[in-house]
């Protein structure tokens, strides 16, 4: 009986040590997850900051282009008026024709962006995915952490987990507005489509440069390899009244 009690006591101590070890491992894992979450959040905030800066720079450039266009329009208008008062009828007619033709060209160029934006808007719910395959693993807006209770993150776009090194493609025709890198998060491409902009990040390689014209489904880069898989981060922004606004990409994407 004494030996049995000794054996039971030893077993109890073993069970206690095992529980303590398991608890320590669990705490360590939680600490590691928390540290990883903080690092991921830091990368997200850096991405948000750089995307916001890039989009606002593009907005300011567009405003300046419009100011310059209006100035040029006014200058030509004043030149045409001056020509009417100093030249004969034939010369005046020639100058009027030139002024009218120039005006048509400027109007066509200035309306190109708005036409592209309108076409983009008309394709809501029908845009192709930025990658050929994969599943959405983090949705737009607030997301609960899968393993840390009570912890959530906010996503300005969506994350699509797909095959390692997958190619990323433009969801609509447009012009590359920005290309930049974020340490630890790969490279980022921003494409403007009139009053809309799309963001593609976590790229290892980039196939386009700032100012490049891109077509529908054109490859813009390939994704970083993350342990045998890749994750494509994708955002859509609307420029409204000179300010950027994030949109839910899931409402805009259709078939592959």
Question: How does the language model describe each region?
Answer:
Residues 105-124, 137-170, 193, 231, ...:
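Short glycine/threonine/proline-enriched tight-turn/helix- or strand-capping micro-motif at secondary-structure
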Residues 189-192, 210-256:
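Conserved, short, structured surface segments that act as functional micro-motifs
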Residues 1-94:
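Alpha-helical oligomerization segments with coiled-coil/rod-like character
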Residues 139, 179-180, 223:
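Residue-level recognition of beta-strand microenvironments
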Residues 26, 136, 160, 174, ...:
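Terminal peptide-recognition signature
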Residues 153, 170-205:
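Zn2+-dependent peptidoglycan hydrolase active-site motif and core
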Residues 67-132, 138, 142:
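Long, low-complexity, acidic/serine-threonine-proline-glutamine-glycine-rich intrinsically disordered tracts
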Residues 8, 168-175, 208-222:
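Short, well-structured beta-strand-loop connectors
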């Amino acid at each position: 009986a004494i030996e049995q009690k000794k054996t039971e006591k030893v077993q109890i101590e073993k069970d206690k040590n095992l529980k303590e070890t398991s608890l320590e491992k669990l705490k360590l894992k939680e600490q590691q997850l928390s540290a990883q979450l903080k690092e991921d959040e830091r990368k997200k905030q850096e991405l948000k900051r750089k995307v916001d800066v890039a989009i606002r720079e593009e907005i300011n450039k567009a405003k300046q282009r419009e100011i310059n266009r209006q100035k040029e329009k006014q200058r030509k208008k004043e030149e045409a008026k001056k020509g009417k008062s100093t030249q004969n009828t034939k010369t005046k007619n020639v100058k009027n024709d030139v002024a009218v033709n120039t005006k048509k060209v400027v109007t066509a160029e200035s309306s190109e962006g708005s036409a592209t934006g309108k076409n983009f808007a008309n394709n809501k719910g029908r845009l192709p995915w930025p990658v050929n395959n994969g599943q959405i693993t983090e949705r737009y807006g607030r997301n609960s952490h899968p393993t840390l209770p009570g912890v959530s993150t906010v996503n300005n776009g969506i994350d699509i987990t797909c095959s390692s090194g997958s190619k990323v493609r433009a969801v609509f025709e447009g012009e590359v507005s920005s290309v930049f890198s974020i340490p630890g998060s790969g490279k980022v491409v921003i494409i403007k489509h009139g009053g809309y902009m799309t963001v593609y990040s976590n790229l290892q390689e980039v196939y386009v440069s700032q100012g490049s014209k891109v077509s529908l489904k054109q490859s813009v880069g390939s994704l970083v390899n993350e342990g045998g898989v890749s994750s494509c981060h994708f955002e859509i922004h609307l420029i409204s009244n000179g300010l950027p606004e994030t949109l839910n990409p899931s409402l805009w994407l259709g078939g592959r």
